[in-house]
From Swiss-Prot:
Protein name listed in UniProt: Minor outer capsid protein P9
Stated role: Minor outer capsid protein.
Organism: Rice dwarf virus (isolate O)
Biased composition (Basic and acidic residues): 285-297
Record's subcellular location: Virion; Host cytoplasm
One GO CC term on file: viral outer capsid
A Pfam family the protein falls into: Phyto_Pns9_10
InterPro entries found in the cross-reference section: Phyto_Pns9_10
Family note: Belongs to the phytoreovirus minor outer capsid protein P9 family.
Amino acid sequence: MGKLQDGIAIKRINDAITTFKNYKLDELEQGGSMAINTLSNVRAHVGLAWPAILRNCLIHTSSHLGFMKFMIDIATTWKVGAFTLLGSVGDEDPFTDVDLIYTKTCLHLGLKDNDFLQFPEEFAYEANSFLEAQSMNARVDMLTGVHNIEDKYVFRMQSISKFLKAYYTASEDVAYLTGFIKPDDSKDSILSAELLKAQVTSEVLRVRNLITTKIQKYINLYEDSQLPHFRQAALSYTQDWDVDGGVPAALPQPDITDDESPVTNPGPSAPPVSKGADQPEDEEMIRKKVETSKDAPPKAVPSGNVSARGIPAFLEDDMSEMDAPDGFHDYLTREHENNFDLAQLGLAPSV
């Protein structure tokens, strides 16, 4: 594959960031989705750098919401091969430094290159381990792997469910996540920081609500399915999310946008909507507050030894048994001699 020139490398990451910035829920359900096609194309050309690109999209404020919608889509779609979108293509890394290229891409797009969410160290490590593991385990050999795709689907959904649960737990303290926001004493800086804090808070609350709502919908649809792989995945979700007792929510929930309409009778696991004092403020409220207060209180700096990107190095020895590399290779193509319908399976093409 060889190393990519900076211009081409920036173009690949540019496509990923832009796609996640505009990602709508249920993109996977649409035939010929431009967003899914773009992500598949990026994935096919970045080799083993794919999990690192996804990691950066997870923690950067511009792409965080879209990335999490993407993960929720994979966790709740009927397309059993959609998880292959998390797998890398090939055995080479064409990037010399993914984080550096990501920083250059942010500058190219007019984004701040230091606006990364500050996740707790435990989740940062778990997220990195998860993405690295899926890079190998979400691959499918078209010659042999497609015949046991349902079994592989169940294991992948169990892993994704645990990732979403870890995110749900780690996102309870939004003040910690926004600890990177440190304005100076100018009104413009204070206003910008408050707006970004409100944006991040609103997006995190929205993701938390989407996770529980969509997981509950999946359980309702498939817990009694005649297809064993759907039934097993629904059972796993039921155990992970304790739907009978409800998933506790420490934060209020925002209003649902058009592409995130609530399901009918979502059940007890959907956290209640709160309109109390902790509800995120809109831009006008924040602007007035900043304009009328010259002495803004200092921003609290969260404790913990976590870097701006908060991701420790992944160690293969720490991979769980379920996520150990299983030897599958990615030879996915759009056509196969047995004429499998990859669109129906939801298998991501590798070329």
